[in-house]
Structures are given as C-alpha cells and as structure tokens.
From Swiss-Prot:
It is found in: Secreted. It comes from Mus musculus (Mouse). Keywords: Cytokine, Disulfide bond, Glycoprotein, Secreted, Signal. Its main location: secreted. The lineage of its organism: Eukaryota, Metazoa, Chordata, Craniata, Vertebrata. This is Thymic stromal lymphopoietin. The record marks 37 as: Inserts into a conserved IL7R hydrophobic pocket, important for IL7R-binding. Residues 1-19 form the signal peptide. The keyword Ligase does not apply.
Amino acid sequence: MVLLRSLFILQVLVRMGLTYNFSNCNFTSITKIYCNIIFHDLTGDLKGAKFEQIEDCESKPACLLKIEYYTLNPIPGCPSLPDKTFARRTREALNDHCPGYPETERNDGTQEMAQEVQNICLNQTSQILRLWYSFMQSPE
C-alpha cells in the first residue's frame, strides 16, 4: 500500500515537472488563430450558455498553460472535451506556434461514463472561453 501511494505521488510530481513553458510561443499568431477560428468554435459549442465560474491568469504564458490543461484533459462527466473542434484547433495552434511544444500523453477518458453530462461540458467550455479572454488582455 505504501509503495502504491509513493508511486502515485511520484507520478503527480513528474507530471507537474513536465509542464511546458509557454513563454517562447508566438503570441501574435496564436491570438490571430483564436480570434479568427477558436473563438467561433467555442461560442458555437456554448450556444449562448453562460456560467459564473471565472478564472483569470496573469500573463499570456500562464493563460496558455491553463488553456492547455482545461482543453486537453478530460474531466469527470465530460470525457470527450479534448475531441471537440476548438480543442483540436487549440492543440494545432500550440504545436505550430510554440517551439518544442511536446504534447504530453493525455488521459483518454476511458474510465469515464460514455454519456456526457451536458452542463459539465458547457461549464468547462465557458471556463476555457474566459481563459482565452484573459489571454487576450494579459501582458506577455
């Protein structure tokens, strides 16, 4: 039992240490892609739904770190979020405009129920939209 707990803690620490530093990204290109493409995908998925969960970030690299995490990692009740069009386009933008961006292995969500809980997905999508807004307002 102690060994399993130690392995779990080690896994968490390794994942935390393997996060990408988004400071070398081409923010101008990513901003254009967001404004012209990703924004429309996000608002289309939300279909006008609004949620009060608000999380901001202090800089463009910090925003991209949160955007990547919330967009590309499945959450309980919404395992298919990383497969949405806006998520695929976000992944492409990061791959194309962040030198050396290593997409880490993602949890594929197979442990999750097959049926999504619509409200959870909409809430997560709303949070991602807010983070993109914060990205647009943040200094480099």
